[in-house]
Amino acid sequence: LVGTVYGSAMLVAETLCDHLQADGHVCQIFDDAALTDIDASRVLLIVTATTGQGDIPPNLQSFASALADRAPYMKGWRYALIAMGDSSYEHFCGAGRSLDALLQELAAEPLVVHLEIDATVEDEPEVAALAWLKTWENRL
């Protein structure tokens, strides 16, 4: 599941999906998903940029709103999350942090501590994301 504004989060998601498929996993990228599109029996990997004042990107807003409004009980759901942002802004990685908190509040289980990628440090966020994925991929 990808929340993107300028394409960096999509590049990260595509890199991770390519790697997972090469390792024999089934992977599908959603950039405009509804809550009903997500199969709760599979691991949900979220890659999201942060926009504005720590906001969720527009293409991920409906998914996040559905989570917040419907507050479904998500016990049994497993997920991993990458939050992307720029640490020179006050609400660094705000979108990812808020989604992570919401998912945990709804009883979803994080497979790993979320990754925060800082655009002021990482010139190639997909490289950092791939290294992170490799540390926990064996849990899939």
Regions found by a protein language model. Give the residues of each.
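Short, solvent-exposed loop/turn elements at beta->coil junctions and helix N-caps
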Residues: 32-35
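FMN-binding flavodoxin-like domain, especially the glycine-rich phosphate-binding loop
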Residues: 2, 6-14, 18-30, 40-44, ...
